């Protein structure tokens, strides 16, 4: 029957031809649809993984470049610029129909505002810690936040911690101890004022501790609040950045020095354009992280995304050794390796826990929204 149909498609009925014409056109064979090259490229799993890793590295390096300037002290201004850039970027993407999120609603904003305050505390303390610590040490210490979140889940949401997860936590603590010891050892043995260097490191560790507490509070609070609002990927990013702008503006004008001398010190004429470009690029990179993380989950899987997040710590830490003067010593490299292994073990523990029937779930066991993940990635990187 199928063969008859094929034959009929190409049969010319002679009695229906115009007798005065010697030419006729037979029906063309059906054209087989071909996938567009752009679609094939967009569904290539390697591309979103590389884009996600590159965005995370760019965010951390740009922030460190701005914050490592001589006596930079306008952290609230930096965060405000990043939020404004982010809002402009996602509004442009929404107008271009690249992404979608719900329109502003005053009632939803009121419910979400406490989470925004926790976010401001998280990103501000993260910027202060990154200002005093090297990128590798900062990346290693951010792992401790995972422990706080996990046990917060156990206390407030009925989560559970497996033996393999506990082992990864032990590796995280060990890597942090090695990193701190390597940092202090290098400060004492290097030339210059060792006391001042150790004092700077101690300030960084204090800010890092506060940041871990703020980050875990933000993540746990967001999980509870998101049930009331049912926010999705870019809804969270939109409200977080929009609501933080007025708060950051008030904080920068009230608490930071806006004298002409301090502005010149923070933005020296020789580096002014580079610093401003880095501030804008760091704001854009948060959008890139959010978009590429959602892309990565869509094209690959949440399991692959978890492993990419764990493996991503290594290139981020190495970027600090390449682009900045982070000490390259055996203890510092050992701390990076142990921290890297702890991330892999934790990712494997999450995957195994997801494969079992769930009586309780760790905070990052289920796929989280891309915007929430990007916020954590950008500041734990």
From Swiss-Prot:
Residues that span the membrane, as ranges: 41-61, 72-92, 111-127, 135-151, 161-182, 201-221, 234-254, 275-295, 304-324, 328-348
InterPro entries documented for this protein: SCL35B1-4/HUT1, TPT_transporter
UniProt membrane topology term: Multi-pass membrane protein
Residues exposed to the Lumenal side: 62-71, 128-134, 183-200, 255-274, 325-327
Region annotated Disordered, chain positions: 362-381
Glycosylation sites: 262
Compartments where found: Golgi apparatus membrane; Cytoplasmic vesicle membrane; Endoplasmic reticulum membrane
Keywords assigned by UniProt, alphabetized: Cytoplasmic vesicle, Endoplasmic reticulum, Glycoprotein, Golgi apparatus, Membrane, Sugar transport, Transmembrane, Transmembrane helix, Transport
Gene Ontology terms: cellular component: cytoplasmic vesicle membrane; endoplasmic reticulum membrane; Golgi membrane
Stored PANTHER family: SOLUTE CARRIER FAMILY 35
Subunit (UniProt): Homooligomer.
Name under which the protein is recorded: GDP-mannose transporter
Gene this protein is translated from: gmt1
